[in-house]
Amino acid sequence: MIEELIRSEIRSFIPYNANQQPYKIKLDANESPFTLPPQMRKKLAEYILEDPQLNLYPDTDSVQLRQALGEYWSVDKENIIVGTGSDQLIQIIANVFLEKGDKVLYPTPSFGMYKDSCVIAGGRAVDYILDQNDNFSYSADKIIKTYELEQPKVIYICNPNNPTGNLMPQDEILRVLKACTKSVVVVDEAYAEFSDTTVIPFIKEYENLLILRTFSKAFGLAGIRCGYSIASEKLTRAVNLTRPPYNISSLSQFTAALILSYKEEIQNNIQYLVEERERVLSKLKEIDGLKVYSSAANFILIKVQNSKDIYRKLCEKGIFVRAFSSSPLLSDCMRITIGTQEQNSILLDELYAICYNK
């Protein structure tokens, strides 16, 4: 009886299932390998000891955090909304803009929430396929052509793209913005710190541009579930219409605002991971039978014919990476998060041994 009550569009959904098995090295979720700076941990402890009054609801508008983000990005706090991870903001965008049957244009392969949020809101998800023969490159021409044909309410660009790691050049994104004026163009920059690129400076020029950012990747705060959007004031006010009240806990607001003051430490971590990414890329390319995709993020996508077998053997060693066996375009692919030099070296050694039967 319960199944009959579920909306027909939702019945086929499969709840997200992260690998919960014991592990030795975890390189499957694009998390940072770095914990918080010691001085920051001390300040967090002081915050708790001083009684943050957790018996009270948090600031429903996250004013201090938005102010800190505004100063960090040189924008006004009125350009910013904070969400429980960018996942919540993606769902809010769908709830605000989609009437039943309205369309969302999203890249494939990419982050699954773009499609799921659309379906949950009663919309129609229309994908544009990234060019598999050109390292999954974006095409502004393809996006614009599909926009003209489908007239979507929302267009998603993931930049760098997850899970392929490639970048859409800024001038190509601007072409899309200039042509697709009747859509909200969402540029998801969850991994942009690793590519040193952003379209945030263009929010004043393009009223329909919305950028998504997160504290989960470069800032190493996946555990507090905090993301944010930056857009024109008019677009920000629209998105804020269905944001749940008190959606960010007091602890999360304080922690996210605090880490913004540790720019040097965070930048050092980013630089470390970028250097490791390039080292791992180079080493992976030395292994016969692997197709290795260049990356502007904190992960690398590889393709190999016996990926399921390799994935299983890595898991047996306690090394977790992400497999995509259910994705037609990525059925032979695995995504490897960049960890510490020690973690990456262990992975490379095990991968080498598996591929060469040693």
Swiss-Prot record:
The keyword Ubl conjugation does not apply. CDD domains: AAT_like (cd00609). It catalyses: L-histidinol phosphate + 2-oxoglutarate = 3-(imidazol-4-yl)-2-oxopropyl phosphate + L-glutamate. The modification N6-(pyridoxal phosphate)lysine is found at K217. Its EC number is 2.6.1.9. Pfam families: Aminotran_1_2. Pathway: Amino-acid biosynthesis; L-histidine biosynthesis; L-histidine from 5-phospho-alpha-D-ribose 1-diphosphate: step 7/9. It comes from the Bacteria. The keyword Disulfide bond does not apply. GO terms for biological process: L-histidine biosynthetic process. PROSITE patterns: AA_TRANSFER_CLASS_2 (PS00599). Its cofactor is pyridoxal 5'-phosphate. Keywords: Amino-acid biosynthesis, Aminotransferase, Histidine biosynthesis, Pyridoxal phosphate, Transferase. One of its GO terms (molecular function) is pyridoxal phosphate binding. NCBIfam families: hisC (TIGR01141). Belongs to the class-II pyridoxal-phosphate-dependent aminotransferase family. Histidinol-phosphate aminotransferase subfamily. Homodimer. This is Histidinol-phosphate aminotransferase. It comes from Ruminiclostridium cellulolyticum (strain ATCC 35319 / DSM 5812 / JCM 6584 / H10).
